[in-house]
UniProtKB/Swiss-Prot annotation:
Source organism, top-level taxon: Bacteria
Chief localization: cytoplasm
Organism taxonomic ancestry: Bacteria, Pseudomonadati, Bacteroidota, Bacteroidia, Bacteroidales
Compartments where found: Cytoplasm
Pfam families assigned: EFP (PF01132), EFP_N (PF08207), Elong-fact-P_C (PF09285)
Gene Ontology biological process terms in this record: peptide biosynthetic process
Source organism per UniProt: Porphyromonas gingivalis (strain ATCC BAA-308 / W83)
Role: Involved in peptide bond synthesis. Stimulates efficient translation and peptide-bond synthesis on native or reconstituted 70S ribosomes in vitro. Probably functions indirectly by altering the affinity of the ribosome for aminoacyl-tRNA, thus increasing their reactivity as acceptors for peptidyl transferase.
Gene, per the UniProt record: efp1
Protein biosynthesis recorded as keyword: yes
PANTHER family named in the record: ELONGATION FACTOR P, ELONGATION FACTOR P (EF-P) FAMILY PROTEIN
NCBIfam families in UniProt: efp, PRK00529.1
Claim: Cytoplasm is one of the keywords in the record: yes
Keywords: Cytoplasm, Elongation factor, Protein biosynthesis
Gene Ontology molecular function: translation elongation factor activity
Official protein name in the record: Elongation factor P 1
Length: 188
């Protein structure tokens, strides 16, 4: 059991038989009345975000999870398939429970969150930054560098990323998987 004082981002809770990850939390101490904690929780099964307010000091059921490395293999109608690099065990995770799934490409390593006691896979986490090749983008106009203008670019996974005007087709770029933003060019 954990209390609201133990809350941290990424913590897994069991609420009414469902598993939730804490996305955000904020301790609020109003001038009048008792303190409370506002949280944004992500349902592991559906991927939906739930806003929940807790009275300060309330006890909640914390779920112990283990992080294990897995390699992405392929996608089918059941979800995304991964393999453990040492045991060659294969697992399938539904796409709704994976953040940044549009940046996942064959062979990428992810961290799977596994329930410590029941050994069920809850979700997986992509690395915060990935390197992707630009497959399509409009050509930038020469000399148009006065402003910080961005243009759409399609990367090798099919996702669309906003990039600066100087980025051309075939270039390797680094993308933040959490918000899909362009980080920079990668030297080859």
């Amino acid at each position: 059991m954990a209390t609201t004082a133990d809350f941290r981002n990424g913590m897994c809770l069991e609420i009414e038989g469902q598993y939730y990850f804490i996305v955000e939390f904020l301790h609020v101490k109003p001038g009048k009345g008792p303190a409370f904690v506002r949280t944004k929780l992500k349902n592991v099964a559906t991927g939906r975000i739930l806003d929940k307010t807790w009275n300060s000091g309330v006890k909640v059921e914390e779920v112990r999870i283990e992080r294990r490395p897995y390699q992405y293999l392929y996608q089918d109608e059941m979800g995304y398939n991964f393999m453990h690099p040492e045991t060659f065990e294969q697992i399938t995770i539904p796409g709704a429970s994976i953040d940044g799934v549009q940046f996942l490409k064959d062979g990428d390593m992810v961290e799977a969150m596994v329930h410590a006691t029941s050994e069920t896979v809850l979700t997986c986490e992509l690395p915060p930054h990935v390197k992707l090749r630009v497959t399509y983008t409009e050509p930038g106009l020469k000399g148009d560098t006065a402003t910080n203008t961005l243009k759409p670019a399609t990367v090798e996974t099919g996702a669309e990323v906003r990039v600066p005007l100087f980025i051309q087709e075939g270039e390797l770029i680094e993308v933040d998987t959490r918000d899909g933003s362009y980080i920079g060019r990668v030297k080859e």
